[in-house]
UniProtKB/Swiss-Prot annotation:
Keywords: Toxin-antitoxin system. It comes from the Archaea. It comes from Sulfurisphaera tokodaii (strain DSM 16993 / JCM 10545 / NBRC 100140 / 7). The keyword Zinc-finger does not apply. InterPro entries: Put_antitoxin (IPR003847). Pfam families: VAPB_antitox. This is Putative antitoxin VapB21. Belongs to the UPF0330 family. Possibly the antitoxin component of a type II toxin-antitoxin (TA) system. Its cognate toxin is VapC21 (Potential). HAMAP family: UPF0330.
Length: 73
């Protein structure tokens, strides 16, 4: 079943630029949404190349964000 949606000119141009030959706009939207979803395992080991200073900075920044969001760390 088809649905009609309204999009801005900018959104249309962006979708059109992503559209491949023979692909419908529905296909483009589905492909883009699926490709933007990441599996948590894609990030496994990603911090392995960080040095101690970078890790400490990361955790300091996270703590500041948690405090700003009023979340207990």
């Amino acid at each position: 079943m088809a649905k009609t949606i309204t999009i801005s000119e900018e959104a249309y141009r962006l979708l059109l630029s992503e559209k491949r030959e023979g692909e419908s706009f529905s296909d483009v939207i589905i492909r883009l949404v699926k490709s933007s979803r990441k599996n948590i395992m894609d990030y496994a080991g990603i911090w392995g190349d960080m040095n101690d200073e970078e890790v400490n900075k990361l955790f300091e920044d996270l703590k500041k964000m948690w405090e700003r969001w009023n979340v207990n760390a």
